[in-house]
Curated annotation (Swiss-Prot):
Signal peptide: none annotated. Transmembrane segments: none annotated. This is Uncharacterized protein MCAP_0867. Pfam families: Hydrolase_3.
Length: 265
């Protein structure tokens, strides 16, 4: 039977043990390409479709069969056809943007994603390293007004914990039905706001129904908090790549590994 591997990208598929390397380990790459000969690879990531697809093709001649992007807000095939998407409710979006405008001077970075693209709305600490890490994501230098007519898959916000607490308090006090994904990049808080009930696990469920895949044929691999929904819904064949940052959640996956080439199928 065909197996379907749903793998996170950062620190899972791209998980070099060479310090400061941003390359996929060759042994992992060989494993994936061998796996794809008779099975299906789905990259399940917080990153956007367009930039990740180009990166994998240009750097590794690797083409996943499907992409779950923006932490489960959208599913595409490798031709760019959208199979599923869930955008933030328009009324909720307007309430959020109105509030963010009142504290925008406390926010360092805002990234927004639509089904067409993902861009930095603004970035107050721009550098070539930032551009490289985000695969050349465009910086628009726009205000929040730019987003009012956009159908948003998600907002990603870099700010202090104090500022984030204000955002979360606003969401809770106004009973805004959204999903929050907690992240950090280079020890800076970088959280995501998605539509209600968006997660990688829910997206896998959606693709499973569309393609009529047995749960026995689904393998999930990840390393971080935004992968927990995958582990919970598909625990039987769940793998976690060990890192310092996931010591507190290692019980969420059935198997612990150092690299994805260790996955059994």
């Amino acid at each position: 039977m065909t197996k379907y591997l749903f793998s996170d990208f950062d620190n899972t598929l791209r998980n070099s043990k060479v310090k400061n390397s941003l390359r996929i380990d060759q042994k992992d790459l060989d494993f994936i390409k061998e796996f794809q000969k008779n099975n299906k690879l789905i990259v399940s990531t917080g990153r956007p479709y367009k930039q990740l697809k180009e990166h994998l093709l240009n750097e590794y001649n690797l083409m996943p069969d499907y992409f779950i992007v923006n932490t489960g807000a959208m599913i595409c095939d490798n031709k760019g056809r959208i199979l599923y998407k869930k955008t933030i409710d328009n009324k909720i979006k307007i309430q959020l943007l109105n509030f963010l405008k009142t504290i925008v001077n406390q926010i360092d970075v805002i990234v927004f994603a639509t089904s067409e693209n993902e861009s930095f709305l603004f970035h107050k600490n721009w550098s070539k390293d930032v551009e490289k890490f985000f695969f050349g994501l465009e910086k628009l230098n726009k205000t929040l007004d730019y987003l009012y007519d956009k159908d948003l898959l998600c907002l990603k916000i870099e700010c202090s914990q104090e500022t984030w607490n204000k955002i979360e308090d606003f969401i809770n006090k106004n009973n805004l039905e959204v999903n929050i994904t907690f992240n950090s990049i280079n020890n800076r808080l970088f959280n995501e706001i998605h539509a209600f009930k968006v997660s990688k696990g829910q997206a896998i469920k959606g693709l499973q129904e569309k393609l009529d895949i047995s749960s026995d044929d689904i393998i999930v691999a990840g390393d971080d908090y935004n992968d927990i929904s995958m582990f919970e819904m598909f625990y039987k064949n769940s793998y976690m790549c060990k890192h310092k940052h996931n010591e507190n959640i290692r019980n969420k996956a059935r198997y612990l590994i150092d690299n994805i080439w260790e996955i059994k199928y």
